[in-house]
Amino acid sequence: MAYKVLVVDDSQFFQVRLKQIINEHPDLEVVGIAANGQEAIDLEESLRPDIISMDYEMPHLDGISAVRSILSKRPIPIVMFSSMTYEGATITLEALDAGAVDFIPKNFAEVSRDSVVLKKRLHEKLLLFAQKAKPSVAARSTTQPSGVRPSALGANLSSSRSPRPASSAPSAPKKRIKGLVKLVAIGASTGGPVAVSEIITRLPANFPVPVIVAQHMPENFTKAFSERLNRQSAVEVREAQDGDLLKSGVVYVAPGGNQLMVDKTGRSIRILDGDARLTYKPSVDVLFASAASAMGDKVLAIVLTGMGADGCDGAKLLKQKGATIWGQDKDSCVVYGMPAAVAKAGLTDEVLPLDQVWQRLVSDV
């Protein structure tokens, strides 16, 4: 039995191509197509799909309004299919705030030319998040995405971005770092925008060290992400630029499509063109490796939710220099991939639930 997918897009071209691409996977089946948000609401009620692919700019009712309406009735994973423009990025982040679980960049050229990369990305994400909607199907499917935590996904689907109390008190620190840390470096991928926001928006304006975030996002998205975080946070948040001086209480978001490195002096940031040999731009490994070289044991590295193992190689270098490494725990991750890789390699000093990460940053750094 395949997962049931509802495709929502006002373009007939994208409707046809997305249906073709999605149906190529044996564990996915498009059961309906909606041309606007209102049709999406109606079809969701009648077809009861397991997951929805949602455009954002449509007549009659836009994607964000549809996301809010649908999620007010039941928790279903919704993946946004988003324009690569700055405007598209801004709206996509609003959709994530509204409860969408993730996004896929909407690239006409990739869809037109039958891109293998797009197919892989689309299939992986739809399968990954549909697993929460109908775990009984996951048990019978021919291909199961690994690492997804239904509990974490369910929380993401049902929670708002408003502040909420921590579920438990912070655990006792295993390694004393108060006054020793001079840089916090955070790496994240799938599920990261919400997780990073949960941490950064809780930091006080006088946070004593600079923070660098490498979040897997395309160009334009990181600019919109940093601006949105800046509006929501007490600390200053900015998209990093080449030559930026590292200042306490400032959060620097690595720009999409590029690599961010800490300068060898440990005082500033270098932004380099994305290396075609590297899958991720920005890469958590590149950030961690440069931080290890420049600042050694003065770094606190945090690996958050995400697919794959980006950050593990960089964490090894950090560990060799005596740096402190925290990993997000399995239950609070949307995808337990990157933190799992670091934990399995024996590199984490502590494994923490997401709601304890910001508390420990405030109390321990």
Swiss-Prot record:
Its EC number is 3.1.1.61, 3.5.1.44. Residues 4-121 form the Response regulatory domain. Keywords: Chemotaxis, Cytoplasm, Hydrolase, Phosphoprotein. Residues 138-173 are annotated as: Disordered. The modification 4-aspartylphosphate is found at residue 55. GO terms for cellular component: cytoplasm. Residues 182-365 form the CheB-type methylesterase domain. Residues 158-172 have a biased composition (Low complexity). It is found in: Cytoplasm. It catalyses: [protein]-L-glutamate 5-O-methyl ester + H2O = L-glutamyl-[protein] + methanol + H(+); L-glutaminyl-[protein] + H2O = L-glutamyl-[protein] + NH4(+). GO terms for biological process: chemotaxis. GO terms for molecular function: phosphorelay response regulator activity; protein-glutamate methylesterase activity; protein-glutamine glutaminase activity. It comes from the Bacteria. The active site is at 189, 216, 310. PROSITE patterns: CHEB, RESPONSE_REGULATORY. Phosphorylated by CheA. Phosphorylation of the N-terminal regulatory domain activates the methylesterase activity. HAMAP family: CheB_chemtxs. Involved in chemotaxis. Part of a chemotaxis signal transduction system that modulates chemotaxis in response to various stimuli. Catalyzes the demethylation of specific methylglutamate residues introduced into the chemoreceptors (methyl-accepting chemotaxis proteins or MCP) by CheR. Also mediates the irreversible deamidation of specific glutamine residues to glutamic acid. Contains a C-terminal catalytic domain, and an N-terminal region which modulates catalytic activity. Belongs to the CheB family. This is Protein-glutamate methylesterase/protein-glutamine glutaminase 1. The lineage of its organism: Bacteria, Pseudomonadati, Pseudomonadota, Gammaproteobacteria, Cellvibrionales.
